Amino acid sequence: YKHSMRLCNEIYSTEDASDETLGLFSTWDFDLSSFQQYAVEALHLGHHVLVSAPTGSGKTLVADAAIRHSSGHHERVIYLSPIKALSNQKFDEFQKKFPEKSVGIITGNVCFNPEAEVLVMTTEILRNTLFQRQMVMEGSLEKGQVDLHFEMDIENDLSKVIFDEVHYLNDPDRGGAVEETMMMLPGSVQLIMLSATIDKPEKLAQWVEGRQTNGDRE
């Protein structure tokens, strides 16, 4: 795709939506807000999604949609949180919401079901795994020298990565892990970024669309 950013801050017009998109909206038994409609449509079309909306406005639905509309081990989803406590909370939540899917969690001291379709982890876990994997590919490390937290065919099996609280990108302590993770992910992976407090979200969107010259998302 040609890289292009679309700012979706107006009322969503269902008159322009396809029947397939309207069918996706009807998955829920309530009317979606405009930003939720824009996000669900963009997810379906394979675009990166950045949602900046107040706490309690329904950002969680966007993450749920990304998980709900992924299927099987060739469309695995990784959900990233900045802190372990939130990872534990989301793991419990996803197990209840998606009983039909396998859900796993990896934190500093817990590794449960790492082969799952939906993996919850802290950002540092994915960053460290991608970094070691990159060093093996470059020949800086032998495969036997690394201790990966999980095994996955990132290029072929990973469909989406959800960055919860993506405003941590601006945090002096944790921001590096978020940025490095985004940089190391293949362009084929769809990014879903959620935040209530991010400053100037359009700047982040512009950075994301330009971060991977070999990517095929917009």
Task: Describe each PLM feature range.
Residues 1-36:
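Pre-P-loop entry segment of helicase/translocase ATPase cores
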Residues 29-218:
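Conserved P-loop/Walker A NTP-binding site and adjacent catalytic elements of P-loop NTPases
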